[in-house]
Every structure is written in structure tokens, then in C-alpha cells.
Amino acid sequence: MAPRVLPLPRQQSFNPPTVLNPFVHPGRLSAGDKLRIALQGIILLPLRAICITFILLLAWLSASIATFCQPGRGFLPLEGWRRRMIQTTLSSLTRTAYFVMGFQVKVKGKVASLPEAPIFVAAPHSSFFDGIICALTGMPSIVSRAENLSTPVFGTILRSLQPVAVSRQDPDSRKNTVAEITKRALSKGQWPQILIFPEGTCTNRSCLITFKQGAFLPGVPVQPVLLRYPNKLDTVTWTWQGYSFKELCIMTLCQIFTRLEVEFLPVHVPTEEEKSDPILFANRVRQIMANALNVPITDHTFEDCRLMISAGQLTLPMEAGLVEFTKISKKLNLKWNHVREQLDTFAAIASASKGGRIGIEEFAEYLKLPISDVLKELFLLFDRNGDGTIDFREYVIGLSILCNPANTEETIRMAFKKSIPSYSMDIALQSVCLVFFQALQIPGIAHRAAEC
């Protein structure tokens, strides 16, 4: 008999994402690709490297002059000749650098002025080459890690853009970053426009993941900016699983040309409802961009990347840690640390299986119970798609729903209502309650076992 998928509360809202892993780019080169890159690189790589080094030094010199003896360094906006120098000289040098690297940039749409849109939101963010948008938009401010400002050469160039610095050591960094973005966006033209990649991390461009709220909290008009790399051979995508920074740089410099399309969509002016609800504002802008790109949206976030890395450290497949953290955390009121702890338990159960999934055998072995009808019904409470295995996402959802005192008994009764005769209902319920209490350490089940 085929396994039945038992209805659980809110089951449809926990459907798996359209794109299972947007943080991986396996990109394998064929033997022909490797040979072609090697032959082209003999000439292109050294020539381009020399030219880029020269351009980089000129950019550093321009940035140094523009920020020399800058009044109110970091606290006041650059004005007058300093700002014009950044907008003209540094912008031209950046465009030249991309031209030397072989980029053929096609621009669609019109760039909004500062009064029209204080903030640019660009997506999908998939590469360090996405920085071309800075040159196309007049060198706006960006959001960057504070550590980047202290790097040689690049740090000086970065400081000239007056970035909003984010410090991982400062516990108040997120709050301060949001406050600084809001202050600049509402400055009525005193500060330059701000460029933000709202996804917060790089993906493989197969979807748009959750947008962070920073760009939308000020409640000002934003201009969506789309990025496309329509190349037969992808040498630009920089994800958590894939080619390294160094490998991508070398492969791209060895290409004769690399196509890049940048499209500026119409400015999105928030409604009063969106101004008071930044999540709604972000989701609507994301949907507009996804429609224009013809890609789906998912609820993945940077926190999923952290779980993915943790899964790899636990010898699980890295994609096992992807749970769409935004959706899971909101609907089940879970914190990242709690989900991370559950990953350890899941890894212990799945260690005997292949592929990072729990089968009925591993489930029974971990619970120290024989495979029985009661255990199979319990297993089906977790196996939401009925494929005979439990992945980490199903494990977190199932355990969280069944641990909820508001619906624990209701869920168990629902699972057994149509499969166990009424005269054995009480025994079955008590057995399952005891299984949860003894093996899964679910709080509040002990006294319920006697009541079932």
C-alpha cells in the first residue's frame, strides 16, 4: 500500500520552495572550455592584469585626493569639487576597468535622480562584478563591512564612496546601520543616493530570496535595478558552493568578452500602507523585480547559508541545512540558535543514512523502538511529502508543530483518526505520547500521556 500523506495544520503554507538551493553553482567546465580559456589567457590575462593594476592605482590616487583633509570625515557628506571628482573621475575609471576586463554592458531604462529615488535596490546579487552599477548610477554610497575600509588601496577607494559601515563586532550594528540609511535617505539631497543589494548575499540568479528591510524602512521611493549575465559560459557567479573569487577572476579575464545587462525599472513610490509596513514594501518591490526577471521568489535568507555551512561541518550534504529560515522562523516562532541545535540532533539520527535524510529504519533505531504501525504513523507526521524519508526542513516543521501545546493533542488525534479503530484509539494515543516524551524530550507531554 502506498504511504498516505496525513493532513497537518497549515500544511500548504509549508510547501517546499520552487528553488531548493539558490546558494550553489556547480558550473563544470568541459575539456574544450578549459582549453579555450587557457589559450585565450596566454595573451588576455597578462595584458588585462597590467591595465587593471594601472587603473586601480589611478582610482586610488583620485580617491585619496578627493578625501584628503576631508572635514567631518565619515560624518559629513562630500561636497563641491570632492563630490564632482568622485562622480566623474572615479566613475570613468570604473567603466574603463570593466571595458578592459572585456565586459559588454547593455543598459536599459533611465537612472532616477536623487529627488526621484534616494535609494537603488539591485537584484539578483550574484557576483562581485555587480559593482558596475556604482559607475552607472554616479557612484552612490553603498553598505559595506567595516573591515573593508581598512584594506590597502581598496579601502581608500571605498571610503571615497562614503559607505554605510556594518561592524560584526558591534551588537548594535544592525540598529545603527538602519538609522544611518534612514538619516541619509531623508536628508533631502545632502547625502548621495544609496545602492543596496537587499538579498544580503550572493545567489545563483535562479530566484529572488528574501529582501532585508534596510532599504525599505525609511519609506522613501526606491528604484529597482535588475542584473542579467546572458553568457553561454558562466564565469561570474560567486556562491557559497562553487568557484572561488580567484578562479572567477582568472576565468573572466581569460574570456574575450562577458555580457552584462543592467535594467533600471520605474521608480516605486510607496503607498501609505507600505510606508508603515516595510516588510510589505520589500515584498512588493521583490515581486515586481521577479516578474520582470521571470524568476520565482523564495523565503531563503543569509541565515540559511549559515545553516548550510553547519550542515557541511556535520558531514551532511550542505543543502540539507536549507529550510527557508524566514518562513519557518515567522510561522513557528523559532530562533536561529534553536534551529541550529536541532540540526545537531538531526545529523545524529541521519548519520547512518546516505543523502542526509532519515528513513523509517533510522527513525526506529534512534527511538530504540521496533517498526510498528504506531511508529509508522508517527513517522508520517514528519514525512510531509510522503516520499518515505524526512529531510531537515520536515524535521524542524514536524517537531515544532508537535511540540506546540496548543495543537499537540489535536495533531496526534488527527493523525490516527482514520487509521486506527476507535476501540484502540486511547492505547495508540498514549503510546505516541510516551514515545515523544521518552525519545524526543518534548515538554509537557508526560502528564498528557495519562490524559490521552
Residue ranges of predicted features:
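Eukaryotic intrinsically disordered and solvent-exposed regulatory patches
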Residues: I37, V105-G109, L114-A117, S126-D130, ...
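Conserved, structured regulatory domains from eukaryotic proteins
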Residues: M85-T89, R95, R145-L186, Q193-L195, ...
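Beta-strand cores of modular interaction/reader domains in eukaryotic scaffold and signaling proteins
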Residues: L44, C51, Q104-K106, F120-A122, ...
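Primarily EF-hand calcium-binding motifs
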Residues: K327-Y366, S372-S400, E409-S424, L429, ...
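Catalytic core of membrane glycerolipid acyltransferases/transacylases, capturing the structured
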Residues: W60-L93, Y98-Q104, S113-P171
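Extended, low-complexity, polar regulatory segments
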Residues: M1-G32, R306, A449
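A cross-family acyltransferase "interaction/gating" segment
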Residues: P152-L161, Q190-Q193, G200, N204-L280, ...
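Membrane-interface recognition of transmembrane alpha-helix starts
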Residues: H25-A59
